[in-house]
């Protein structure tokens, strides 16, 4: 009689389980080797026991090359996998941005009063509240801008007033210093306005004509006027001028 069919379930007895694992592992490795030799196939077999011990068989020279070949056939190359993931992510991002742009364009048209037909009552009320909020924000921004400009102008005005006061104070101090310098009697270089120093050497320029009283009757009137003029401007005519005038009339 042949063997009965073995029920496929885990063997409860640990010893029997280990014996069965060793027998079947050897037969499996033998079958893998026979398959690779008889059919000229590239066979790779990896077995881990329940304790984590590794058993392997590879018909090629390197197990890693066989595994890379397996990965390329099933999952493609790592680079192509990364590129495909990036492409898929970029496509999803593009679709999100496209939907966002369409929503913004539709909202912009609604704010401009266009394409309001498909909107319902609630959507129109929401649009109205949005417009009111935008107007309040715009007015608040404009008011703040005007207040900032006003404050800036006030600061400039204050700076100009301070500069004007400083210049005025300097001008007054300079004027007072000049007046004190002009009217100070101890300053020998100062000269008063509208005053000339007295000339005590007028006699050096004035030489009266020496003539007989009886001879003055026959003099011309021009000589008399020249003499009177010389007496009036006694401090400004040099001595030689009178002699030239009298000689011209003689």
From Swiss-Prot:
Record-linked InterPro entries: MADS-box/MEF2_TF, MEF2-like_N, TF_Kbox, TF_MADSbox, TF_MADSbox_sf
Q: In which tissues is it expressed?
A: Expressed in petals and weakly in sepals but not in the column (gynostemium).
Record-linked PROSITE patterns: K_BOX, MADS_BOX_1, MADS_BOX_2
Domain K-box: where? 87-177
Source lineage: Eukaryota, Viridiplantae, Streptophyta, Embryophyta, Tracheophyta
Tell me what organism the protein belongs to.
Aranda deborah
Residues annotated as domain MADS-box: 3-57
This chain belongs to which protein, by name? Answer: Agamous-like MADS-box protein AGL9 homolog
Q: Name one GO biological process term.
A: positive regulation of transcription by RNA polymerase II
Can you supply one Gene Ontology CC term for this chain's record?
A: nucleus
Q: Sorted alphabetically, which keywords does the UniProt record give?
A: DNA-binding, Nucleus, Transcription, Transcription regulation
- An annotated Gene Ontology molecular function: RNA polymerase II transcription regulatory region sequence-specific DNA binding
Q: Does the keyword Repressor apply?
A: no
Give a short account of what the protein does. Probable transcription factor active in inflorescence development and floral organogenesis.
Write down the SMART domains for this protein, in alphabetical order.
MADS
């Amino acid at each position: 009689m042949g063997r009965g069919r073995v029920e496929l379930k885990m063997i409860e007895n640990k010893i029997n389980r280990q014996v069965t694992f060793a027998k079947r592992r050897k037969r499996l490795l033998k079958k893998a080797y026979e398959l690779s030799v008889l059919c000229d196939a590239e066979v790779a077999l990896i077995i881990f026991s329940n304790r984590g011990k590794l058993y392997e068989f590879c018909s090629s020279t390197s197990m890693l090359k066989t595994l890379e070949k397996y990965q390329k056939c099933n999952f493609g190359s790592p680079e192509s996998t990364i590129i495909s993931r990036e492409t898929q992510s970029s496509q999803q991002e593009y679709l999100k941005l496209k939907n966002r742009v369409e929503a913004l364009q539709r909202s912009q048209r609604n704010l401009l009063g266009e394409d309001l037909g498909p909107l319902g009552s609630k959507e129109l009320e929401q649009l109205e509240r949005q417009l009111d909020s935008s107007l309040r924000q715009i007015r608040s921004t404009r008011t703040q801008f005007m207040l900032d400009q006003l404050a800036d102008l006030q600061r400039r005005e204050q700076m100009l007033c301070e500069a004007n006061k400083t210049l005025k104070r300097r001008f007054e101090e300079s004027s007072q210093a000049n007046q004190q310098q002009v009217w100070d009697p101890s300053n020998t270089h100062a000269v008063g306005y509208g005053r000339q120093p007295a000339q005590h050497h007028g006699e050096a320029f004035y030489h009266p004509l020496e003539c007989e009283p009886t001879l003055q009757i026959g003099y011309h009137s021009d000589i008399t006027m020249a003499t009177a003029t010389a007496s009036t401007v006694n401090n400004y005519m040099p001595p030689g001028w009178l002699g030239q005038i009298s000689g011209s009339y003689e």
